[in-house]
């Protein structure tokens, strides 16, 4: 019989119960025990959903209060020493302080989990790091699953991926040298799981899909030789890309099974068809929301079943934490666009799709004929739908003039024209875009959407907030202002709602980091901007002040990356469609007198393919799409872009090729680490490295901000340096926001006086 299993499940709950409970706990409105009880109830629901879908194992250990890599730092005793916490006796408050910072320490750095929109907390390894096992996180969840009578499979990220994802801190050394100390701690953790009755243990090694150095690849042999001594069957799970180049190594490892992502990299199956152990085929897309064509999947699985017999397992391609919880609650979408609804599949539907595949493999296709027919009908309808393809979009892309994505003049000429009218001081200060979104603002937006607030009352509320934001910025003496984005629920969703070719869910939330969830748009068809989207708000804000007002757009690559994207045409084509649509908005802003326009691209690096060999092609089309979004603007219009959550030292030439007049970047959490690259690569345009971390409510000291600014001045000419926070301030409160910005402006004025 074919075995089915799940690699991981969404953590936040069907209705984001965990998010709201966490935030109440942080505000001291919820007792710790109540938070723990809610989390336990969520885990039970998750496991019961998996069991109801006939999964042979439920995944345990994947649930987390913030991040599974943070949990692993605790489990291995690798929490940053600078906090002074004892990993063996860590309180829940201390756990959250690691993630969010406290009055004495900034939060652990956060970055993207491979090429997804999930963020993990980056382990800080030091030469003196002393690992110590604390398996309580996993053991406690196993005990809960056992108490429910469930067959379970613990899930833990493997030691090589864990080390690879971290960074060296302090005295120079190579974190790879810590491996021999780390492996015995893993053995101790795994033994604790075995003692609780674990027969199979899933060890995730997604780093194998990267371009790992030879010594790291070779280390898999010795590491798994040690781990395999544990009295359990190990399932080595890979995902997000092909591991075919490591096929001989993986087939020789002393593990009981191997999981392959056959959605992202179906071609790799050929390299493993002679695998002699359990082969887990990841055939249901774990990162997107499109319904599978189950007949096509079975065309792949049935020959595999004939070869492998009971050694064939089936699963989603990766953890389902990247997909929304349940399509069935999307009643409005079903009523509004029945066809699109029939093409979608969320977490609960995906585990049921897996169940259909399992029944078909075990009992024949006829046993699930109705489900297969429904799947086929949806696939056929989508392939021929006229809702998806709009000829005028393809025609416009095909007929773009040569050089459409290039500015009229080089930066050196543009900046002279821009400076002539901007007349800004040295080290100009600005905000990245959003200001705090109060309960009142969110309520007004929600009431308007529900039809409970008239358009006139809604616009009055937004204008009142915009004026408040403008006045606060004037009081702080910021140089280039923003309107604050009160009208925007999300930087991608807002634009998607105003562009044709996008659809929206009501409950399609996925975790971004900690309690932060996002509701990605669904790009299902060709993209067009039917009318202006932001012009009236920026125009109104500009009418309130004599200072420069910055227009705010989200760039094409970020809209693409932070959406669930159609999979029937290349992503590059979708991205260029969005870029061209945005260019209409940019020209309308320019015509309305908004001559500083920011086109945010925080997600440009996360779109990089995992293999470097594929980078150039991606960077070429991503850069073209970005430049297309401002095609046709005049030289004296200043185009800004913003990037966050990223490391771009290795793609600086591509970032420079975007040719934005000003780039602002997130750097404070990594102590301006990005700027070390500027010693070799002289970024040609203006740059604003973030001088404080907006992910924490902590107000930075003047000394800290000055330290970062002086580091920046060491590598960036003062004439080209801007001063700004790391990112937008949407998630912060007003009190801390004012205090944080005041420190930033005061320090800037001090340095201006020095440099004058």
Swiss-Prot record:
What are its E.C. numbers? 2.1.1.14
Reactions accelerated catalytically: 5-methyltetrahydropteroyltri-L-glutamate + L-homocysteine = tetrahydropteroyltri-L-glutamate + L-methionine
- One Pfam family linked to the record: Meth_synt_2
Keyword Repeat attached: yes
Name the UniProt key words of this record, in alphabetical order. Answer: Amino-acid biosynthesis, Metal-binding, Methionine biosynthesis, Methyltransferase, Repeat, Transferase, Zinc
Q: Name one GO molecular function term.
A: zinc ion binding
Query: Catalytic residues per the record?
Result: 695 (proton donor)
Q: Give the cofactors, semicolon-separated.
A: Zn(2+)
Binding residues for L-homocysteine, per the UniProt record? 432-434, 485, 600
Q: Does the keyword Zinc apply?
A: yes
- Record: residues binding 5-methyltetrahydropteroyltri-L-glutamate: 16-19, 112, 516-517, 562, 606
- Record-listed Zn(2+) binding positions: 642, 644, 666, 727
Please list the residues that bind L-methionine: 432-434, 485, 600
What CDD domains does this protein's entry cite? CIMS_C_terminal_like, CIMS_N_terminal_like
Pathway per its UniProt entry is: Amino-acid biosynthesis; L-methionine biosynthesis via de novo pathway; L-methionine from L-homocysteine (MetE route): step 1/1
Question: Which note does the record give on the cofactor?
Answer: Binds 1 zinc ion per subunit.
Task: Please give a single GO biological process term from the UniProt record.
Answer: methionine biosynthetic process
Q: Per its database record, what is this protein's job?
A: Catalyzes the transfer of a methyl group from 5-methyltetrahydrofolate to homocysteine resulting in methionine formation.
Entry's family note: Belongs to the vitamin-B12 independent methionine synthase family.
Query: What is the name of this protein?
Result: 5-methyltetrahydropteroyltriglutamate--homocysteine methyltransferase
| Species of origin | Haemophilus influenzae (strain PittGG)
The taxonomic lineage of its organism, from the top, reads:
Bacteria, Pseudomonadati, Pseudomonadota, Gammaproteobacteria, Pasteurellales
Q: Which gene encodes it?
A: metE
């Amino acid at each position: 019989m074919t075995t089915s299993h799940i690699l991981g499940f969404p953590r936040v709950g069907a209705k984001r119960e965990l998010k709201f409970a966490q935030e109440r706990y942080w505000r001291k409105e919820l007792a710790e025990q109540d938070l723990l009880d809610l989390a336990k109830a969520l885990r039970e629901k998750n496991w019961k959903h998996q069991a109801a879908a006939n999964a042979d194992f439920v995944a345990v250990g994947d649930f987390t209060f913030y991040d599974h890599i943070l949990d692993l730092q605790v489990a291995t005793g690798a929490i940053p020493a600078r906090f002074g916490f004892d990993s063996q006796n860590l309180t829940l408050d201390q756990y959250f302080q690691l993630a969010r910072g406290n009055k004495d320490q900034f939060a652990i750095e956060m970055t993207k989990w491979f090429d997804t929109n999930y963020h993990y907390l980056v382990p800080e390894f030091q030469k003196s790091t002393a690992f110590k096992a604390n398996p309580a996180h996993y053991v406690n969840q196993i005990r809960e699953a056992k108490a429910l009578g469930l067959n379970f499979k613990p899930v833990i990220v493997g030691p090589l991926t864990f080390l690879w994802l971290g960074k060296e801190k302090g005295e120079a050394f190579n974190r790879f040298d810590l491996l021999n100390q780390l492996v015995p701690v893993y053995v101790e953790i795994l033994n604790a799981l075995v003692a609780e009755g674990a027969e199979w243990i899933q060890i995730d090694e997604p780093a194998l899909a990267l371009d790992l150095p030879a010594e790291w690849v070779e280390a898999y042999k010795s590491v798994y030789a040690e781990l395999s001594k544990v009295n359990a069957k190990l399932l080595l799970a890979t995902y997000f890309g092909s591991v075919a180049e490591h096929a001989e190594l993986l087939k020789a490892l002393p593990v009981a099974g191997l999981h392959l992502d056959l959605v992202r990299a179906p071609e790799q199956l050929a390299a493993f068809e002679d695998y002699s152990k359990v082969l887990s085929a990841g055939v249901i897309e774990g990162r997107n929301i499109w319904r599978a064509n189950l007949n096509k999947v079975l065309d792949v699985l049935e020959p595999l079943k004939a070869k492998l017999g009971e050694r064939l397992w089936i699963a989603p391609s990766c953890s389902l934490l990247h997909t929304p919880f349940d399509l069935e609650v999307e009643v409005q979408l079903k009523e509004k666009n029945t066809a699109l609804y029939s093409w979608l599949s969320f977490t609960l539907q995906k585990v049921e799709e897996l169940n259909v595949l399992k029944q078909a493999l075990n009992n024949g296709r006829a046993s699930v004929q109705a489900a297969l027919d429904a799947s086929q009908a949806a696939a056929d309808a989508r392939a021929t739908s006229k809702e998806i393809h709009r000829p005028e979009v393809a025609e416009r892309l095909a007929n773009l003039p040569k050089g459409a994505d290039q500015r009229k003049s080089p930066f050196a000429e543009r900046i002279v024209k821009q400076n002539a009218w901007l007349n800004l001081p040295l080290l100009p200060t600005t905000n990245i875009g959003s200001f705090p979104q109060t309960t009142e603002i969110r309520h007004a937006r929600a009431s308007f959407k529900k039809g409970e607030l008239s358009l006139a009352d809604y616009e009055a509320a937004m204008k009142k907030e915009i004026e408040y934001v403008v006045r606060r910025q004037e009081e702080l003496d910021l140089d280039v202002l923003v309107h604050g984005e009160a009208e925007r629920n999300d930087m991608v969703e807002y634009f998607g709602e105003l562009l044709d070719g996008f659809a929206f869910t009501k409950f399609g939330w996925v975790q971004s980091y900690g309690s932060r969830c996002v509701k990605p748009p669904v790009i299902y068809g060709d993209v067009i901007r039917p009318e202006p989207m932001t012009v009236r708000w920026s125009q109104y804000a500009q009418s309130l002040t004599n200072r420069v007002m910055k227009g705010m757009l989200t760039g094409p690559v970020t809209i693409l990356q932070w959406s669930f994207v159609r999979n029937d045409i290349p992503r590059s084509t979708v991205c260029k469609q969005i870029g061209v649509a945005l260019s209409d908005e940019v020209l309308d802003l320019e015509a309305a007198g908004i001559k500083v326009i920011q086109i945010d691209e925080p997600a440009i690096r996360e779109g990089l393919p995992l293999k470097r060999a594929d980078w150039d092609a991606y960077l070429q089309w991503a850069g073209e799409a970005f430049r297309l979004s401002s095609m046709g603007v005049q030289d004296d219009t200043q185009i800004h872009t913003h990037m966050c959550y990223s490391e771009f030292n290795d793609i600086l030439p591509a970032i420079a090729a975007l040719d934005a007049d000003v780039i602002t970047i997130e750097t404070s959490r990594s102590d301006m680490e990005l700027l070390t690259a500027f010693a070799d690569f002289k970024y040609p345009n203006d740059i604003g490295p973030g001088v404080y971390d907006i992910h924490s409510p902590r107000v930075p000291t003047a000394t800290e901000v000055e330290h970062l600014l002086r580091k920046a001045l060491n590598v960036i000419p003062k004439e080209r340096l801007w001063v700004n926070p790391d990112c937008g301030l949407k998630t912060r409160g007003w009190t801390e926001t004012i205090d944080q910005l005041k420190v930033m402006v005061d320090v800037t004025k001090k340095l201006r006086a020095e440099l004058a």
